[in-house]
């Protein structure tokens, strides 16, 4: 899969964007913002297919979630991605993990030597979370060997690869706020 440069818009704003050329959809949001996609995907396919790229949903894999729920969320991400591809959409896989134990399955079904997306939001606010994120990132790089990593949020200096950074909504909001001063 080739990398397509685009401006990324959260799924929660997808229906309000008028000119969708050069834009893609991400799901780096609270799960409640996009769970409706799982229950009624055919309703959203026409809108989503009008975008240049769509990342797979970033269903939560919190470390305190039961393993069955984590695997179920991983499955839902893959099912939605495969369905959107069948509908002709250009899909970018979102890669996520919870802890070292999740490495046994969280990279299953992901493409190698292609474009992937990750988010560091919520992972850099404690030493333990930061270390777990970096351990998963290194594991992802070793196993998947991505050509590009679309990175949402703060990029830790230890992260390597061809990183394409997307500013998190809070950063864009802060920049807009500061520019009005």
Language-model features and meaning:
Residues 17-20, 30, 37-180:
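Eukaryote-skewed repeat-based solenoidal scaffolds used as protein-protein interaction platforms
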Residues 1-27:
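Basic, amphipathic N-terminal segments that precede the first structured/catalytic domain
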